[in-house]
């Protein structure tokens, strides 16, 4: 399974990338806006840190706007993946872009039919949202399972990026269900390395070693 970082904070990306577990990065307009910096500059900086797919999202609403913006974004770096919203206009754009060899990540997927449509249109990645589905009482895990089953059954080349990840339990569950990728907020990465028993165990080891060295 691959781990992507869901952030545009360059310093956080640089620090977490040193762990050797980061395979890519995802961003969206909300994440970019929180940084208060130029969109293109941020994406290019991220591409220099992480050697993997870097998702950058369009902001246009029509297919024509998305296509024009995507063509421009795709030129920023070979690792850039253009993020497209799951709408009818987004599907039109994805179809055109896929034929041009531009990698796409179709986002805001909440149903199997949406995921299937995105894959049919040629999406490189599809991003179902875990936390947001839980917020409305829906079962995000069934969605992941169903989408993975469809990919395996029909041979679609798209990969599932489990998004809207909020807890380590989310990561563990989607890993078991066959999501190819989990995109994880930077604060959660730190929490996933920690456990009180690990901390206490290390403390005991060090205390015992200090006593022995005396």
UniProtKB/Swiss-Prot annotation:
InterPro entries: Aldolase_TIM, TAL/FSA, Transaldolase_3B, Transaldolase_3B/F6P_aldolase, Transaldolase_AS, TSA/FSA_arc/bac
EC number annotated for this UniProt entry: 2.2.1.2
GO terms for biological process, alphabetical: carbohydrate metabolic process; pentose-phosphate shunt
Pathway(s): Carbohydrate degradation; pentose phosphate pathway; D-glyceraldehyde 3-phosphate and beta-D-fructose 6-phosphate from D-ribose 5-phosphate and D-xylulose 5-phosphate (non-oxidative stage): step 2/3
Entry-linked Gene3D superfamilies: Aldolase class I (3.20.20.70)
GO molecular function terms listed in the Swiss-Prot or TrEMBL record: aldehyde-lyase activity; transaldolase activity
Active site: 83 (schiff-base intermediate with substrate)
Subcellular location, record wording: Cytoplasm
One matching Pfam family: TAL_FSA
Gene Ontology CC annotations of this record: cytoplasm
Chief place where the protein resides: cytoplasm
Keyword vocabulary terms for this entry: Cytoplasm, Pentose shunt, Schiff base, Transferase
Role, per record: Transaldolase is important for the balance of metabolites in the pentose-phosphate pathway.
The protein's name in its UniProt record: Probable transaldolase
Lineage, top ranks: Bacteria, Bacillati, Bacillota, Bacilli, Lactobacillales
């Amino acid at each position: 399974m691959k781990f992507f970082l869901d952030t545009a904070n360059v310093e956080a990306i640089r620090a977490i990338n040193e762990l050797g577990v980061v395979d890519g990065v995802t961003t969206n307009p909300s994440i970019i806006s929180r940084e208060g910096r130029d969109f293109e500059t941020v994406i290019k900086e991220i591409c220099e840190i992480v050697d993997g797919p870097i998702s950058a999202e369009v902001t246009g609403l029509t297919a024509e706007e998305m296509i024009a913006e995507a063509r421009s974004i795709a030129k920023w770096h070979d690792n850039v993946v253009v993020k497209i919203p799951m709408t009818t206009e987004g599907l039109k754009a994805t179809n055109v872009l896929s034929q041009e060899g531009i990698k796409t990540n179709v986002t805001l997927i909440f149903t199997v039919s949406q995921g299937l449509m995105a894959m049919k249109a040629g999406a490189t990645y599809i991003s179902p949202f875990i936390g947001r589905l839980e917020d409305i009482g829906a079962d995000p895990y069934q969605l992941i399972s169903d989408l993975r089953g469809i990919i395996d059954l029909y041979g679609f080349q798209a990969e599932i990026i489990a998004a809207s990840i909020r807890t380590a339990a989310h990561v563990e569950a989607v890993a078991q269900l066959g999501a190819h990728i989990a995109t994880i907020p930077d604060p959660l990465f730190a929490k996933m390395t920690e456990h009180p028993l690990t901390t206490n165990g290390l403390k005991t080891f060090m205390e015992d070693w200090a006593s022995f060295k005396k």
